[in-house]
Design a protein with these regions (language model features):
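Short, Lys/Arg-rich nucleic-acid/phosphate-binding segment
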Residues: 89-96, 101
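Short capping segments at the starts of secondary-structure elements
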Residues: 40, 53-57
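N-terminal positioning helix adjacent to the helix-turn-helix/winged-helix DNA-binding module
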Residues: 40-43, 94
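Alpha-helical DNA-recognition elements
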Residues: 78
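Amphipathic alpha-helical dimerization/coiled-coil segments
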Residues: 2-30, 101-129
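A short acidic, leucine-rich amphipathic alpha-helix
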Residues: 60-64
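Pre-recognition alpha-helix immediately N-terminal to the DNA-recognition helix
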Residues: 45-49
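Glycine-centered, phosphate/nucleic-acid-interacting loop/turn motifs that mediate DNA/RNA or nucleotide
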Residues: 82-83
Length: 129
């Protein structure tokens, strides 16, 4: 499933420089489990892309991604439990931001995504363009 405009050239804009950066093994394992190892992986990565571009609340994410609100909330819970996003606020309109773990480990996240894509090697089964 190629990603829509949420991920194109937003989160991985410096991808050309990633080949020279060493991948963190712990982060590789974490990203592998969250973004490739369980159901909802595409949704979680799309959420990361969306909030990296513009931090927003769950309702706005639901509309922007054209997904059910409960689906968004479940994915947000998984991302929060793994400290990959930060919640600001105390209620329905909470705004979500990517954590420092995401921003400081983009090359590792990119490596995980590309490794899975290489295993899939099927047309139409891409995380990112």
């Amino acid at each position: 499933m190629p990603f829509d405009s949420l991920c194109r050239n937003k989160i991985f804009k410096d991808v050309a420089n990633y080949e020279d950066i060493k991948v963190d093994k712990f982060m590789h394992k974490l990203f592998s489990s969250v973004f490739t190892g369980m159901g909802g992986r595409y949704t979680r990565l799309r959420i990361i892309c969306a909030i990296t571009e513009n931090p927003i609340n769950a309702q706005e994410l639901s509309k922007k991604m054209n997904l059910d609100y409960k689906t968004i909330i479940h994915s947000i819970d998984v991302l929060e439990k793994n400290n990959l996003i930060i919640r600001e606020g105390a209620g329905y309109g909470d705004v979500f931001f990517p954590s420092d773990i995401i921003s400081s480990n983009l090359p590792t996240l990119y490596a995980v995504i590309r490794k899975v894509e290489a295993k899939l090697d099927k047309p139409g089964k891409k995380y990112i363009e």
